[in-house]
Amino acid sequence: MDLKPIVALDLPDPSEALKLVHLLRPHIDFFKVGSQLFLAGGTDIIRRIIDCGADVFLDLKFHDIPRTVFRAVTEVVKLKVKFTTVHILGGREMLKEALEASAGSDTEILGVTVLTSMDDRGLESIGIAHAVEEEVLLLASMALEVGLRGIVCSGKELPLLGKLKKRASILVVPGIRWRGAAAYDQKRIIEPGEAKKGGATHVVVGRPILEAHDKVGLVQKLLCELNAIN
């Protein structure tokens, strides 16, 4: 299985998040910490997950003036997380500063294209007149030209990114749902197997696992599905 699943710890309570890490750790070795859990648990939650032998994806989606992002990424690197995110919309200079701050570290900077909660109408409402697919291609192309190696996009755009002259070596896909499951606030969703077929290197699964009665069972189902696809 080349594609690696990441479980999103979208929980308000650090102790509950750590319980879930311990429960799933025999099967999963990569966990995402977003803004809610990071604000609740601080840097300690990052260290405790890493102490469990797992990698951490710190998903704070930095989008600020270039020097502020440089300073933020400088602090993130000290935590020894595997991935962290910046909004590509912050522009070339901001992306360059993020890369400079992470240089020489093991922390990979991922560029966020268009949130999976957005669709064409959502983009139009904030003044972006073209379709999601066009915006994702534009942003991903710019990020890769600047030097980022990783892109975050929905599974719907994977085929388009595969046609770019410069390819991303890391493609992280959130918005993972099984057929028939509630989409909630996600607009652009995909099943895990389809994401793998499309070329994703990582899928982020949160709510389906968090809300499952048998969390381990669902993770095992996920791994079986991914292993079955060559």
Swiss-Prot record:
Instruction: List, from the UniProt record, the residues annotated as the active site of this protein.
Output: 61 (proton donor)
Q: What is its EC number?
A: 4.1.1.23
Pathway in which the depicted protein is active:
Pyrimidine metabolism; UMP biosynthesis via de novo pathway; UMP from orotate: step 2/2
Swiss-Prot/TrEMBL keywords: Decarboxylase, Lyase, Pyrimidine biosynthesis
Q: Which InterPro entries match?
A: Aldolase_TIM, OMPdecase, OMPdecase_AS, OMPdecase_bac, OMPdeCOase_dom, RibuloseP-bd_barrel
- Could you tell me the Gene Ontology terms of the biological process aspect for this record? 'de novo' pyrimidine nucleobase biosynthetic process; 'de novo' UMP biosynthetic process
* Highest taxon in the source lineage: Bacteria
GO terms for CC?
cytosol
Keyword Lyase (UniProt) = yes
* Chain positions recorded as substrate binding sites: 10, 32, 59-68, 116, 177, 186, 206-207
The record's Pfam families line, in alphabetical order, gives: OMPdecase (PF00215)
* Keyword Metal-binding among record annotations: no
What NCBIfam families does the database record attribute to this sequence?
PRK00230.1 (NF001273), pyrF (TIGR01740)
Self-association and partners = Homodimer.
This chain's function reads: Catalyzes the decarboxylation of orotidine 5'-monophosphate (OMP) to uridine 5'-monophosphate (UMP).
Q: What is this protein called?
A: Orotidine 5'-phosphate decarboxylase
- Species source reads Methylacidiphilum infernorum (isolate V4) (Methylokorus infernorum (strain V4))
Gene assigned in the entry: pyrF
